[in-house]
Every structure is written in structure tokens, then in C-alpha cells.
């Protein structure tokens, strides 16, 4: 074989290999893009968010129409249980997004290393900085709603309306208060944080005085608030925004959220991209959509929380039945966690 023929042989061989290599890559890319899992976004969340009256179903429809992805919600119980499941699956991640972690458990999520930082497009323009600050500046969680914790009071009950957390320890409220378990429920944990913020190292003394007045400690918000609506007790831990739902759908102002002069702790709920998510691009698309005007407009009349997107106008029922406390308190999550352990031991004995 002469040099010319030899050159042509090697040239053709190299070109052939390049073409085959290109075909191989394209085949792999095509196979990957045809993977049905990459067309689906799986989101872990809590029960009330995807209940028949929650925002989940409408957000799913809007997201699928806007993006072409399919959205699968997975009910994990209450907020703390959502985190627990994600941590258990850390080495075998099944979901793409976790939704419903709040400022009282966000540090635990960060410490567990289950979240990947992602800042949605236009987040700085849409979400107020003070709301963002509640979840930190790492953007492992994107705020989607917020409200202050409050005791919801039934004005048709035979007990007076409390004016402070201290009032709740009075004998007149014996077995009149419904709380939620702080080990499984974010409102339950939020109430503990509220007591820590006000009583500090005396918080256990407060709970000793409060103990006789607790009717039950429900596993989650849905079950606890359900008992309240059935008339089992005249007081339940919830949010300052909760009475607006009764004004809007029950046409009643029977239930109110008294504002305490001492102040209230705030809950900011967030959603985050799970590290190792099977569909990372789909997860990012979901987080981008979650803070959009279209998704956020669903929040007020289904989630009964303030939308994180400041451009979304609140309905009239919020203006008449969702008071805004003048003083926002905060508590160290580590101190709150320690208090939870001590409080649950106290209540068990």
C-alpha cells in the first residue's frame, strides 16, 4: 500500500470512528431524553397541601400546562415527617423537590446535606428580603408562603379570649387547648419556638403550668384543626391568616386570631431541590414556577397563608380577618429542639 493509499485508509478510518462515536453519543442522548422519569417531577410534601381543598391540585394543573412536565405529589404526613423521609432516602433519592420545610427545621435539612442550592429566576424581584432571611441566604430553600403563629379562638365558647401566652395557663382554660406534636408537626414545633422566644430558659416552667390545659396534642395540623372545627376545644394553634378561610367559605367571623402584645413567631415555608434528584432540570422548572404570579395567586384562598411573591394581591377576607402582628419574635432552632425533648418528657409524666 502506497503512502497515498495509507493516508486515505487512516483518514477514512478516523472519520468513520468519529461518525460512529457521534452516533453513539446521540443515541445515548436520545435514550436519556426518552426516559419518562425526566418528564416527571416528583415532589414530597405534607398532607394538607395536597388535600382536596389545598393548593396542590391547582398548582399541578397550572405547572403541567405551563411547562409540559408531569407533576407527582407524594404525601409524607406533616412537615417534620417530610424532612424525615428525605433524610432516610438520602443515599437513594427518589424525589426531586421537597416542599413544606420551614424556618424552624431548615437548619436540620442543611445539616443533613440533603439539599442543593438553587435560586429561582427573578427571586430577588419577587420575594421580600425579610421573608428570604428567615430561611437563610444559601437558597437551599425557596420561600413560597408565610404567616405568624397564633391561637385561634372560638368566640361562641364559654371561655374568655386570651390576651397572651401567659393567659393560656389560667385554670379557666383547663382541657380547652389543642396543640400539635412538635416532633411531627411544623405548627407544633412553631408553638414551642414561640414559647421559647418569650420565656427563654424559663420555658419548661411555662409548660408545667400549661400542661393541665392541653386537651390533646394532635400528630399534625389537619387532624388538630379538624378537632377544633368539630368543637372539641375553643382554642387551637394555627396562624393569624386562618380566620380568613372561615370568612371566605363559611361566611362567619366566629373564629379569630387574637394578637398578643408580647409578639408572635413567624413561619416561612420553603421548597428545595434535593441533592441527587433524578430530574434536576424539572425540579428547577418547578421552583421557578412555584414563585411565579400564576402559582402564587393560588396560595391565599387554598393554603391560607401569605404568598411569598409580593406582587400577588391579597383577597378582601385577609384584610378583615387576618391581623398582622406588630412584633415578630424568633427563637434559636437548637434551643427549640432541646426544649422539645424536655417538654415531651414533661408531658409524658
Where are these regions (language model features)?
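Short beta-strand->loop
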Residues: 116-125, 140-142, 166-169, 248, ...
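Ligand-binding pocket segment of bilobal, Venus flytrap-like solute-binding proteins
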Residues: 193-258
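Short, low-complexity disordered leader/linker segments with a strong preference
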Residues: 1-41, 349
Amino acid at each position: 500500500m502506497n503512502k497515498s493509499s495509507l493516508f486515505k485508509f487512516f483518514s477514512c478510518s478516523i472519520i468513520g470512528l468519529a461518525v460512529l462515536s457521534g452516533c453513539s453519543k446521540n443515541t445515548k442522548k436520545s435514550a436519556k431524553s426518552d426516559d419518562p422519569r425526566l418528564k416527571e417531577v416528583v415532589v414530597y410534601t405534607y398532607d394538607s397541601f395536597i388535600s382536596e381543598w389545598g393548593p396542590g391540585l391547582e398548582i399541578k394543573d397550572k405547572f403541567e400546562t405551563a411547562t409540559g412536565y408531569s407533576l407527582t405529589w407524594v404525601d409524607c404526613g406533616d412537615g417534620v415527617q417530610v424532612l424525615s423521609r428525605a433524610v432516610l432516602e438520602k443515599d437513594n433519592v427518589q424525589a426531586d423537590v421537597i416542599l413544606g420545610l420551614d424556618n424552624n427545621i431548615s437548619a436540620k435539612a442543611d445539616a443533613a446535606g440533603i439539599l442543593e442550592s438553587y435560586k429561582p429566576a427573578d427571586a430577588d424581584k419577587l420575594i421580600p428580603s425579610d421573608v428570604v432571611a428567615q430561611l437563610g441566604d444559601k437558597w437551599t430553600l425557596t420561600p413560597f408562603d408565610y404567616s405568624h403563629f397564633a391561637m385561634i379562638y372560638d368566640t361562641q365558647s364559654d371561655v374568655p379570649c386570651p390576651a397572651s401566652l401567659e393567659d393560656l395557663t389560667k385554670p379557666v382554660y383547663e382541657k380547652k387547648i389543642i396543640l400539635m406534636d412538635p416532633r411531627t408537626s411544623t405548627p407544633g414545633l412553631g408553638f414551642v419556638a414561640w414559647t421559647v422566644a418569650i420565656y427563654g430558659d424559663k420555658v419548661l416552667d411555662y409548660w408545667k403550668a400549661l400542661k393541665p390545659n392541653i386537651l390533646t396534642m394532635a400528630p399534625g395540623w389537619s387532624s388538630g384543626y379538624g378537632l377544633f372545627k368539630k368543637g372539641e376545644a375553643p382554642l387551637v394553634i394555627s396562624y393569624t391568616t386562618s380566620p380568613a378561610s372561615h370568612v371566605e367559605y363559611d361566611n362567619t367571623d366566629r373564629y379569630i386570631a387574637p394578637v398578643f402584645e408580647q409578639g408572635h413567631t413567624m413561619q416561612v415555608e420553603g421548597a428545595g431541590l434535593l441533592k441527587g434528584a433524578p430530574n434536576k432540570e424539572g425540579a428547577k422548572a418547578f421552583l421557578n414556577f412555584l414563585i411565579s404570579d400564576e402559582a402564587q395567586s393560588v396560595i391565599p384562598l387554598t393554603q391560607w397563608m401569605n404568598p411569598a411573591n409580593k406582587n400577588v394581591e391579597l383577597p378582601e377576607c385577609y384584610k378583615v380577618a387576618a391581623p398582622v402582628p406588630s412584633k415578630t419574635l424568633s427563637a434559636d432552632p437548637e434551643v427549640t429542639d432541646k426544649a422539645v425533648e424536655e417538654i415531651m418528657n414533661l408531658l409524658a409524666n
